[in-house]
Curated annotation (Swiss-Prot):
Heme b 1 binds at H50, H115, M116, Y117, S118, H120, E180. It catalyses: Fe(3+)(out) + L-ascorbate(in) = monodehydro-L-ascorbate radical(in) + Fe(2+)(out) + H(+); Cu(2+)(out) + L-ascorbate(in) = Cu(+)(out) + monodehydro-L-ascorbate radical(in) + H(+); monodehydro-L-ascorbate radical(out) + L-ascorbate(in) = monodehydro-L-ascorbate radical(in) + L-ascorbate(out). It is a multi-pass membrane protein. SMART domains: B561 (SM00665). Residues 1-7, 70-78, 145-151, 223-290 are cytoplasmic. Its cofactor is heme b. It is found in: Cell membrane; Apical cell membrane. This is Plasma membrane ascorbate-dependent reductase CYBRD1. Residues 260-272 have a biased composition (Low complexity). Plasma membrane reductase that uses cytoplasmic ascorbate as an electron donor to reduce extracellular Fe(3+) into Fe(2+). Probably functions in dietary iron absorption at the brush border of duodenal enterocytes by producing Fe(2+), the divalent form of iron that can be transported into enterocytes. It is also able to reduce extracellular monodehydro-L-ascorbate and may be involved in extracellular ascorbate regeneration by erythrocytes in blood. May also act as a ferrireductase in airway epithelial cells. May also function as a cupric transmembrane reductase. Disruption phenotype: Mice are normal and do not display iron stores defects, even in the setting of iron deficiency. These results, reported by PubMed:15961514, suggest that Cybrd1 is not an essential component of intestinal iron apparatus. However, according to PubMed:16326980, no direct measurements of iron absorption were made by PubMed:15961514, suggesting that final conclusions can be drawn only when direct iron absorption studies are carried out or mice are maintained on a diet containing ferric iron only. It comes from Mus musculus (Mouse).
Length: 290
């Protein structure tokens, strides 16, 4: 199936990938050039893993996981395969985010810095906990085959909304963290005097913001949504559970097929059904008067 507005989608996708990749490159340049590099010894070098892993995993990889269903050249792949890729990317993002938080806590322990005192830390840790919860719920409800369609119908809109909300929250948290770090480390010259590190890192923040905006735009365009697979039935709750409506859809489809195959047979079947309904009503009336 051809995608409507394919060229526009492709342009935005390439732009998002380019801006996201530049964000990762910029955060690496920041810590390697301006912040003395990376390490795992309780010093500031260990802390530097925090922005690198947060931007790479929690922002860039999570953004790709959000739009993976929108890639038109994957529409011929099975839904199970795409679910596995979506879950795998989110799992990688969660692992990198966890390691980034561990690096911060170890740095604070060694340097005797208080934990969890800033708004950045409150929002960031909350987002990580909810992100892991979202990943676990999605795994058991959507990836494993045991969940009933009615449960999936209930969870799906919550899953979509909370995923986008968490992605936006993560971007806001990263921007808060970058600004907070610059206020701490830029003393001579100070942040407000426009030092090269401050300007460079502000540019990193703008790249992250643009990447998030592109991902939000791509994932909210209805014409770029992955089409339903042939024979599938949308998960809805209005008017009964999903399983009942699936059976009803199959019955309706069968009736249409019979009509198209032989109009005479369809007419005789309709007349027979009418006679049965008449007899049934008569029989029902007799039973009600007995």
């Amino acid at each position: 199936m051809a995608m409507e507005g394919y060229r526009g989608f492709l342009g935005l996708l390439v732009s998002a990938l380019l801006v996201g990749f530049l964000s990762v490159i910029f955060v690496l340049i920041w810590v390697l050039h301006f912040r003395e590099g990376l390490g795992w010894n309780g010093s500031g070098l260990e802390f530097n893993w925090h922005p690198v892993l947060a931007v790479t995993g929690f922002v860039f990889i999570q953004g790709i996981a959000i739009i993976v269903y929108r890639l038109p050249w994957t529409w011929k792949c099975s839904k199970l395969l795409m679910k596995s890729i979506h879950a795998g990317l989110n799992a990688v993002a969660a692992i990198l985010a966890i390691i980034s938080v561990v690096a911060v806590f170890e740095y604070h322990n060694v340097q005797k810095v208080p934990h969890m005192y800033s708004l950045h830390s409150w929002v960031g840790l909350t987002a990580l906990i909810l992100y892991i919860q979202q990943l676990v719920v999605g795994f058991f409800v959507f990836l494993l085959p045991w969940a009933p369609p009615s449960l999936r119908a209930i969870v799906m809109p919550i899953h979509v909304y909370s995923g986008l909300l968490l992605f936006g929250t993560v971007i806001a948290t990263v921007l808060m963290g970058v600004t907070e770090k610059l206020f701490f480390v830029l003393k001579h010259p100070s942040y407000h005097s426009f030092p090269p590190e401050g300007v460079f890192t502000n540019t990193l923040g703008l790249l992250i913001l643009v990447f998030g905006a592109l991902i939000f735009w791509i994932v909210t365009r209805p014409q770029w949504k992955r089409p339903r697979e042939p024979g599938s039935v949308p998960l809805q709750l209005n008017g009964g559970n999903a399983e009942c409506r699936m059976e009803g859809a199959i019955a309706i489809s069968s009736a249409h097929s019979m009509d198209a195959a032989d109009p005479a047979d369809a007419e005789s079947s309709s007349e027979g059904a009418a006679r049965k309904r008449t007899l049934g009503l008569a029989d029902s009336g007799q039973r009600s008067t007995m």
